């Protein structure tokens, strides 16, 4: 029998003051807890009151992590009852503070696996040790080179994997005993960390090239061998590594990169929701991306695939896309184009004034986009002039300033709504309160990846899918984009975070059905909805 102290220290089985008198007797816990036996809801209410006494968001997050480290059921029950309030604290943006201060704040490893680039021989044993006999179905891994908007944070980025898994569980209901957070410590190029005596990771510059990719390959092989029904989620890798890794494994295993695919899927869902409101077709739209990095190009790729799915040829679809970066409109003769940008760069010969298209305003005037999406982190770049220009040639311009945090957004939703006389269909990267405009409350959809990746992954896991295909991704986007209320003035293009659990199930069912339809399920499934519901974990004792 497990010794009593170990039971109280194991967050998977600890109930704290909710252990009954009979359980306390049986498990040897008599005298180790206060006399009162609490119901789970009593614990939740008490813990929430303690949470409310904390002042800063960082203090609140550290408190919640103490609960997580102690009692998973209590943590997730509390989180599920306060999703809207807790999401920005458990995850983005507050998680950035704990990542930047991880070494100074370090208390315990939170069940994560720490892989050292210099010790590939330890990959298998590390994963085994961290899993501790659990049946791992979902693994979130990061090398933390491109964390959120804050860059390279080395081993401290493990927090992003831990936080991501928390969202998976509260949104979709993945059992926390079947997930594992992994960080690959490949060094860091962050000088602040390299000079910090308290930094807990490897103190050398990032390893690149064959040694790095060989390590990744060994990791994938060991993970697949140890956990045969695995869904592998890559998080916050650097730009070049992210796409190389995804391209290497997406046709071999069920795998997903949130930075490349997640933002693309949720923006596609938002665009589909906007088009449902306006009654227009995607294949009639002209798309402009302001920002052509990992996120921007991930969105372009997703919408391009959807246009092809809707009947355009590959080349026809490409003509609907235009990229604007810091140097202006990107042209096909630019020697610095990335492999992702090259297929979508404009032909210089198509523009008489090509040399003058060196900023967003000029590009908008030349191209006349009907959809404008910002991932540039250049604040206030969607100007009144641009919004009014778009509103002049398209009835319902789709404008998504999704850079975050708020101070980096390309425009404020309220301004875009006002400048377009209420015509713009808006998505943002941060939560926005309802906006009163001409007697109506306009709801603003948040293009938050958390709307999509939990249901997407859960559906693939429920179907025991061998791969995550473009068709499954498209099914996810359509299921989310189909939730909008087209009868209501000011309806949001995406559903609210408050309904996260409900529509995560909708997404999961759509994805699982598509996997079964494509014959990708490892085991026969007669009833997809039942398979999804049977997998769902509820936080209860």
From Swiss-Prot:
Molecular function as annotated in GO: carboxy-lyase activity; malic enzyme activity; malolactic enzyme activity; manganese ion binding; NAD binding; oxidoreductase activity, acting on the CH-OH group of donors, NAD or NADP as acceptor
Names of required cofactors: Mn(2+); NAD(+)
Species for this entry: Oenococcus oeni
A GO CC term attached to the entry: cytosol
Job of this protein: Involved in the malolactic fermentation (MLF) of wine, which results in a natural decrease in acidity and favorable changes in wine flavors. Catalyzes the decarboxylation of L-malate to L-lactate. It can also use pyruvate as substrate.
Activity regulation note: L-lactate and ethanol are non-competitive inhibitors, whereas succinate, citrate, and D-tartrate show competitive type inhibitions.
Descriptive protein name: Malolactic enzyme
Binding-site list for Mn(2+): 235-236, 259
Pfam families named among the record's database cross-references: malic (PF00390), Malic_M (PF03949)
Swiss-Prot/TrEMBL GO biological process terms: malate metabolic process; malolactic fermentation
